[in-house]
Curated annotation (Swiss-Prot):
Organism classification: Eukaryota, Metazoa, Chordata, Craniata, Vertebrata
GO biological process assignments: digestion; proteolysis
Protein name (Swiss-Prot/TrEMBL): Pepsin A
One GO CC term, this protein: extracellular region
Gene Ontology MF, one: aspartic-type endopeptidase activity
Propeptide: 16-60
Active site: residue positions: 92, 275
Family: Belongs to the peptidase A1 family.
Disulfide bonds: 105-110, 266-270, 309-342
């Protein structure tokens, strides 16, 4: 009996899932709108969501556009250093680097956020490597260092990360996050940096080489990133597994996109990235323009595609067929409701690749489907949320 108890305890310990709660906050776009700064920002900054996926090969000077995070609403807390210094970050499956503001940065954008102080960490190790994160007309520049990162109860030692030294421009002052924690593949990591999850797995800190994401539609909370396991209480039915078509981003093949049984986009298949770091559902501008027309969306002065809220009751599902399985998006998912009105969850952008133009399955899609990012088998698992 004692042996049975011991074996069950070992099994439980091997399957332990480390969870990071995600809090839903107002997006940077909404903060800028409330401050009356959005119009000025849009005039001086060219927002190109595609730029995130058009980076040149990783180099010593990393560049990662920040405009892509304008509409992000889900954020989690990590600790860096010994003792840990807390930071609010975006858990981003569309990038691979970790960076946060540092005390070396004195710009207003940095002063309004948590800043890492290497001198207050007994485990920090500096390097001579530089980092650059581009946005609009300027860029955040910084250095790379190593330290211990606390994430969801995991102690990730000797983790490389970026420390900002300059953050020009005023818009980052209102950002609801301090930094970014990338969860894509090492092949797209800037400066040859080892991504956080790779470092965690290499140290044997989780029992399964995967992590999973649940994004709640609830404004209060409930969203979570889980490292090292799958919690079936967050979804219904079985997970459907989709092999990756590229081990860079979490890239998969979509068979077709239909409405009322008719193909409206992605005829003959297309490539898509499952990206927690993109709020909307993005695709080629021509295809998205057609979809916006189907759902009656029109652009307002803030660059948003406005939809009549009453249309939610009459619009049809938009169905993504992936690896032979249909994933319907109801209008309540792709029409975003707020106190200011209703907007389309679709966004046009052009990302040409050798295999055609890319689609981005962002939070609009992930809110409907519990997602497993399986590094061990290079696949994505999808199931309807519970």
């Amino acid at each position: 009996m004692k042996w049975l108890l011991l074996l069950s305890l070992v099994a439980l310990s091997e399957c332990y899932i480390y969870k990071v709660p995600l809090v839903k906050k107002k997006s940077l776009r909404k903060n800028l709108m409330e401050q009356g700064l959005l119009q000025d920002y849009l005039k001086t900054h060219s927002i190109n969501p595609a730029s995130k996926y058009l980076k040149e090969a990783a180099s010593m000077m990393a560049t990662q556009p920040l405009e892509n995070y304008m509409d992000m609403e889900y954020f989690g807390t990590i600790g860096i250093g010994t003792p840990p210094q807390e930071f609010t970050v975006i858990f981003d499956t569309g990038s691979s680097n970790l960076w946060v503001p540092s005390v070396y940065c004195s710009s207003p954008a940095c002063s309004n956020h948590n800043r890492f102080n290497p001198q207050q960490s007994s485990t920090y190790q500096g390097t001579n490597q530089k980092l650059s994160v581009a946005y609009g007309t300027g860029s955040m520049t910084g250095i790379l260092g190593y330290d211990t990162v606390q994430v969801g109860g995991i102690t990730d030692t000797n983790q490389i990360f970026g420390l900002s030294e300059t953050e020009p421009g005023s818009f980052l002052y209102y950002a609801p996050f301090d930094g970014i924690l990338g969860l894509a593949y090492p092949s797209i990591a800037s400066s040859g940096a080892t991504p956080v999850f790779d470092n965690i797995w290499n140290q044997g800190l989780v029992s399964q080489d995967l992590f999973s994401v649940y994004l709640s539609s609830n404004d209060q909370g409930g969203s979570v990133v889980m490292f090292g396991g799958i919690d079936s209480s967050y979804f219904t039915g079985n997970l459907n597994w989709v092999p990756l078509s590229s081990e860079t981003y979490w890239q998969i093949t979509v068979d077709s996109i239909t409405m009322n049984g008719q193909v409206i986009a992605c005829s003959g298949s297309c490539q898509a990235i499952v990206d927690t770091g993109t709020s909307l559902l993005s695709g080629p501008t021509n295809a998205i323009a057609s979809i916006q027309g189907y759902i009656g969306a029109s652009q307002n002065a803030n660059g948003e595609m406005v939809v009549s809220c009453s249309a939610i009751n009459t619009l049809p599902n938009i169905v993504f067929t992936i690896n032979g399985v249909q994933y319907p998006l109801p209008p309540s998912a792709y029409v975003l409701q707020s106190q200011q009105g209703c907007t389309s969850g679709f966004q046009g952008m052009d990302i040409p690749t050798s295999s055609g133009e890319l689609w981005i399955l962002g939070d609009v899609f992930i809110r409907q489907y519990f997602t497993v990012f399986d590094r061990g088998n290079n696949q994505v698992g999808l199931a309807p949320v519970a």
